[in-house]
Amino acid sequence: MAVLLMGAAMFTACDDNDNEQHEYIVPVTKGAFLVCSGNMSSNIDGSVSYLDYTSNQVANKQFQAQNGRSLGGTPNDALVYGSKMYIAVTGENTLEVVDAKTLKSLRQIKTNVTFGEGCLKPRHLTASGDKVYISFYGKSESSYDENWNATTKGNGYVVAIDTTTFTRQGIYEAGSFPEGISVADKKLYVCNSDYAACTKPSISIIDLTTGSGSLIKNDNIVNPQKIVLTAAGDMYVLDFGNYGDKKSGVYKISAKNNEVTRLIDANDMDCIGSNIFGYYTEFDASYKPVKTTYQVYNLLSQGTSTFYTDTNNEIIPACIGVDPVVGTVFIASNVKNADTGKTDYKANSKIFMFNVEYSQHGVFVSASKNANVWGATAGVGPCAFAFNVTTNVIKY
């Protein structure tokens, strides 16, 4: 994730001479992309769904529709940066670069061929300046004993590529099974998940100028997946837990002393300004979803609010996304199998949209259903949102 919490998304250009024309540039979101990983065991390829804000309609399998070919197996993440969208396709060892307006392919990159043989299984993306960064499982490997205790070995990588030539500009060794990444102040932050083995999870901090790095390790950080940063350098990490006694949640890692504090239970998170949105689902013994809590944590007040109460368990959330311009919240949901009551991972998903009101200081006030996009059909295996943000020039 490349979002800097508590940062302003305002672009202005003006002149003090009142006789000259003034203009300012306003970011505008045209729509939302939903990356869907498909279902590997059922041979269902991944896809991209697109919600157009003007029509409030969702169009599915848009990459395939525009390019006449499938994305392939298990796309995992996407990033809109400038005029392009980058899609990390884990199962194919490819990075797809497309025009963000049309989804027409600009380049299909075989990562282990173009970037180096260790660049296997691309996972997550972020960007800074003229570079896009991609995390790779790389040489990370896992194995299990007869009691299903996991052992991991080897490390992954993060590669920096030029946004014009798509050539490799740098490669950085990370830890075991790296996932989410972020860049700030010429430093690269990497969530080393250790594939939930809980033996050597960590956060890598790599100096992009010198290539030197350090690790943050803490007993509470056992399976880190996403990371966002404040201007002060504090880190906010989504950790999936150990699927046992340690629940998934959002943690703060202090920039002053690396102190780790748990903030909220969460299976996923996204943020805007000083607000972190997340959800947490509880399951019964047969792994049927029982209850989901939808919360927003504010960094300024350090308080937590509920932004939705799903009394009918209508939503089985799979991922969350927040429009970086206006703060609209989206949740992609799996659906229940009508016969078993369990989640059907082979069925099409649904998109649920929330209109959100913020104070003049950008603090969450309330959220409400958007009836125009409530339960819209999307692809199989939803896993990540990306937003089609462009700019308008207003002259005065």
What residue ranges belong to the model's regions?
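Conserved beta-strand positions in repeat-built beta-propeller and related beta-rich domains
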Residues: 34-43, 87-91, 134-144, 190-198, ...
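Bacterial Sec-dependent N-terminal signal peptides
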Residues: 1-33
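A short beta-strand motif characteristic of beta-propeller blades
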Residues: 57-70, 104-116, 166-172, 211-218, ...
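Short loop/turn segments that connect beta-strands within beta-propeller blades
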Residues: 53-55, 99-103, 161-166, 206-211, ...
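Blade-level signature of beta-propeller repeat domains, shared across WD40, Kelch, NHL, RCC1
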Residues: 346-396
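Acidic, serine/threonine- and glycine-rich low-complexity intrinsically disordered segments
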Residues: 164-287
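Repeated scaffold domains used in trafficking and secretory/extracellular systems
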Residues: 22, 70-79, 116-127, 174-185, ...
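Structural motif
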Residues: 42-50, 94-97, 142-157, 197-205, ...
